[in-house]
């Protein structure tokens, strides 16, 4: 069965039946409206964020499968912080604040794409990203939280999520 893969970035829950997607789907003999509807359903939980999507199409049967990826770390942090874009000056202009628990939940969601093996290391990496886009965590500079995480100040909170972290397949 010859398959064709279409890899695209879409806005979660807001895919439109226009170019460049529609012509590609039409060439493969797919119903554009139906595919767009299914894309919007599949990405609705990521409303307003750019989401990587792969559509696997069987050229013979015209059956297709939609595989939704995970939005970028920046997009997830921005959504959680209620901001639309990163700070142009993250050292001086803060765009939002998150709890460490919110950061941990994003880390768990992103685990399949991360190279870090421990929850603690992944959280420290995510704190670095938060700092680079102007998001504070626990009303502090994320760099300060990295030190506190290393010192063990949040070990109890991390332990609470350790099982969930371990259950996620890489």
Curated annotation (Swiss-Prot):
GO biological process: one example: translation
Keywords of the record: Ribonucleoprotein, Ribosomal protein, RNA-binding, rRNA-binding
Cited InterPro entries: Ribosomal_uL11, Ribosomal_uL11_C, Ribosomal_uL11_C_sf, Ribosomal_uL11_CS, Ribosomal_uL11_N, Ribosomal_uL11_N_sf
Gene Ontology CC terms: large ribosomal subunit
Gene3D superfamilies per the UniProt record, alphabetical: Ribosomal protein L11, C-terminal domain, Ribosomal protein L11/L12, N-terminal domain
Stored Pfam families: Ribosomal_L11, Ribosomal_L11_N
Gene Ontology MF, one: large ribosomal subunit rRNA binding
Function comment: Forms part of the ribosomal stalk which helps the ribosome interact with GTP-bound translation factors.
Family assignment from sequence similarity: Belongs to the universal ribosomal protein uL11 family.
Subunit: Part of the ribosomal stalk of the 50S ribosomal subunit. Interacts with L10 and the large rRNA to form the base of the stalk. L10 forms an elongated spine to which L12 dimers bind in a sequential fashion forming a multimeric L10(L12)X complex.
Protein name per UniProt: Large ribosomal subunit protein uL11
Organism: Saccharolobus islandicus (strain Y.N.15.51 / Yellowstone #2) (Sulfolobus islandicus)
């Amino acid at each position: 069965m010859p398959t064709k893969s279409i890899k695209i970035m879409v806005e979660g829950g807001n895919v439109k039946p226009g170019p460049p997607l529609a012509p590609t789907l039409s060439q493969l003999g797919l119903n554009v409206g139906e595919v767009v509807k299914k894309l919007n359903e599949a990405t609705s939980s990521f409303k307003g964020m750019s989401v990587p999507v792969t559509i696997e199409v069987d050229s013979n049967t015209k059956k297709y499968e939609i595989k939704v990826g995970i939005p970028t770390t920046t997009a997830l942090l921005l959504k959680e912080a209620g901001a639309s874009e990163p700070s142009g000056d993250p050292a001086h202009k803060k765009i939002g604040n998150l709890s460490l628990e919110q950061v941990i939940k994003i880390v768990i969601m992103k685990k399949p794409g991360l190279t870090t093996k421990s929850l603690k290391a992944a959280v420290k990496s995510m704190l670095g990203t938060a700092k680079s886009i102007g998001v504070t965590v626990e009303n502090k500079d994320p760099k300060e939280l990295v030190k506190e995480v290393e010192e063990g100040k949040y070990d109890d909170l991390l332990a609470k999520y350790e099982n969930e972290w371990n259950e996620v397949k890489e």
